[in-house]
Amino acid sequence: MTDSTCPMIRNYGAIVPESQTMVKDDSELDIFSEKYREPVFASVLRSIGCFLGYACIPTNGLCGRYYPYKSISKGYRGVVQEFGRVKREINDGMHYVNPVTESISQVDMRIKVIDLDKKDVMTSDKLSIKIDSVVYYQVTNIHDALFKIDNVVQSIIELSYATLRNVIGNSTLEVCLTRRDKIAESIKSIVSEATNGWGIEIKSIQITDIVVPTDIINSLSSAIVAERQAEAKIILAQGNVKSAELMRQAADMLDSKVAMQVRSLEVIDKLATSNNSKIVFLPTDLNLSTRNNIIYSDIQSTN
């Protein structure tokens, strides 16, 4: 119902003033149990309200603010106040109120989302980034949400920003980029603990975007390229050292007399198995029996 037809019904935004966040003392909130002496004039006003309300019932709401039945939308809850004091809480539906002495404050009980604008934050490695995030919350206690905290939405925004700066300030850029969900969960835990007693529940906090400036991206890319080039040089140097070691070991093996004789025999064997005519020069360091065997095998193959 709009303000023009029912000005006594106020929405949540109208109830909570745009002021500095302030939690009220519990002693000021004991409005259900505190007893007080009602002035006689209050009874007179209540009687007048009842008369006007019942008189306006046949008009089916044409009397405007004096129509006694007010509706609460689905997903909302209301608090009925009389002379500034809470009388009862009401659910969605049609309810009778005294049009003179009573008013209804409505609160949206559905899950709501707050889109936090991008903020510049500094990581622990002194890099400035922009972070975009959203907060999902729900009112769970209408009484606390109305009377324990001024401007719930603004309070959640300021608390979320402060927590975001603190958590990101203790994390490196690499952690922010690779462990976004863990950071969001840490922020949610801190904000939930701080809002305990506000009559709300923080359902979720999500980091939707992390913007890294172009100059930081370029510098990081250069650092990564340099690091990979250094690693490649190290791998190449290690390969050269290994290759040199293997070549040295092979040279040591070939320098031995046994190795030289084996290689000579291999060459002579290849020559002996060839069909072409050949002249074989035998090394002088071979012993006589070996030379005779070679010559004999060569003659046999020729025949």
From Swiss-Prot:
SUPFAM superfamilies: Band 7/SPFH domain. The lineage of its organism: Viruses, Varidnaviria, Bamfordvirae, Nucleocytoviricota, Megaviricetes. Coiled coil: none annotated. This is Putative band 7 family protein R614. It comes from Acanthamoeba polyphaga mimivirus. GO terms for cellular component: plasma membrane. Signal peptide: none annotated. Pfam families: Band_7. Belongs to the band 7/mec-2 family.
